Structure formats: C-alpha cells, structure tokens
UniProtKB/Swiss-Prot annotation:
Keyword annotations of the record: Cell wall, Glycoprotein, GPI-anchor, Ion transport, Iron, Iron transport, Lipoprotein, Membrane, Secreted, Signal, Transport
GO biological process per UniProt: siderophore transport
Function summary: Involved in the uptake of non-siderophore and siderophore sources of iron. Has a role in the retention of iron in the cell wall and periplasmic space.
UniProt propeptide residues: 183-204
Membrane topology: Lipid-anchor; GPI-anchor
This protein's record includes keyword Glycoprotein: yes
Induction of expression: By iron.
GO annotations of cellular component type: cell periphery; extracellular region; fungal-type cell wall; fungal-type vacuole; side of membrane
Name of the gene this protein is made from: FIT3
Lipidation (GPI-anchor amidated glycine): G182
Region entry Disordered, spans: 84-104, 133-175
Predominant place of localization: secreted
Stated name of the protein: Facilitator of iron transport 3
Compartments where found: Secreted, Cell wall; Membrane
Length: 204
C-alpha cells in the first residue's frame, strides 16, 4: 500500500513540473464535429473526499468532469447555432399551399436549409378587404358610422377636459413677489392687497 502511494505521489510531482495540462475535447452534434482545446493548471492537486483518495485519480476525475461539462456546453452551442440557421432560412419560401376556410386562410410555408426541411403554418383573416389608396379606403366588415361616433365622443371628451383644466387654472391665484425701491432701501412685498397697502404707505 505504501509503495503504490509513493508512485502516485511521484506521478503527481512529475505532472506538477509540467505546469499545465492541455486537453482536447471532441463533441458531435447533428453530424457536425466540434473540438475545443483546454489548458489547465497542472499544479492543482485535488485531495479527494477522504484521506485515502489518491491525488492522481482525483485529478483525473476532475478532468473528466470538466471534459463532460465542456462537451455539454459545446453541444448546446451547436444546437443554438442550428436553431439560428433555421430561423434565417424560414425567410426563403420555396413552396406554399393556400387553403381557404371561409373567414380565414391557412398557408403552409416550406423551406429547406442544409438538408433540413422546415414548415410553418400561418392563419390569416379572410375578411380583410383593401380597396386602394383613394378616399374610399374601407376595412370590411366594420362599419364607418361606428368608428366616426367613437371619434366624435372621444373629441368631445377631450374638449371638456381641456375646458375644465383651463377654468381651474383661471380661478387659481398665485402669490407673486415684486420689488419696490423706496428712497431709503429696497422693500419686497406681495402683489395682493397687503402689498398694495404697503406700497401706498411708502409712496406717501
């Protein structure tokens, strides 16, 4: 037992002299191969969960956990990149099929990108009617009388609110300060009745 622990310690010491360990991680996702090179500090020694765990096996376990985490991260990145490519390719429509269903139209859009086929189903309102750029623009089946009544009531409400606001502003009074310079020194007084009385006394 002592002999094997001495070999383990010498292996750890030899690894520590190298100062760094370079590991290449390989992951495969959807037929694509991703590689990543990771350099770790070789002077780190994991002592294990108890006093009998060897440093070498613990270091190897730590490196394996790191490799698994990096592989998972690379695979996740790959999946995100594939999704992004799918969203980009959906703009290029290759074929579509329209099916009228009375008040709505269902369109199926099919796109192909990198050998993958993507489909999207879109449902649109079939009652929409665009009649041109002139003054007779209408939106069917809504009526114009309802919308004009709504606009009228909205305008009258706005006018009433504005009138109430302005009348309340007119009825409010504020105290302003004015400066009066007499013969001896400057006196500051309010512009109300008290200020007028004080100014009259000063002028006499």
């Amino acid at each position: 037992m002592k002999f094997s622990s001495a070999l383990v310690l010498s292996a750890v010491a030899a690894t520590a002299l190298a100062e760094s360990i370079t590991t290449t991680i390989t992951a495969t996702k959807n037929g694509h191969v991703y590689t990543k090179t990771v350099t770790q500090d070789a002077t780190f020694v994991w002592g294990g969960e108890d006093s009998y765990a060897s440093s070498t096996s613990a270091a190897e376990s730590s490196a394996a956990e790191t490799s698994a985490a990096e592989t998972s991260a690379a695979a996740t990145t790959s999946a995100a990149a594939t999704t992004s490519a799918a969203e980009t390719s959906s703009a290029a429509e290759t074929s579509s099929a329209d099916e009228g269903s009375g008040s709505s139209i269902t369109t199926t859009i099919t796109a192909t990108k990198n050998g993958h086929v993507y489909t999207k189903t879109v449902t649109q309102d079939a009652t929409f009617v665009w009649t041109g750029e002139g003054s007779s623009n209408t939106w069917s089946p809504s009526s114009t009388s309802t919308s004009s009544e709504a606009a009228t009531s909205s305008a009258s409400t706005t006018a009433t609110t504005t009138a109430e606001t302005s009348s309340s502003a007119t009825s409010s009074s504020t105290a302003e300060l004015s400066s009066y310079t007499g013969a001896a020194d400057a006196i500051t007084a309010g512009t109300g009745l008290m200020g007028a009385a004080l100014a009259a006394v000063m002028l006499l």
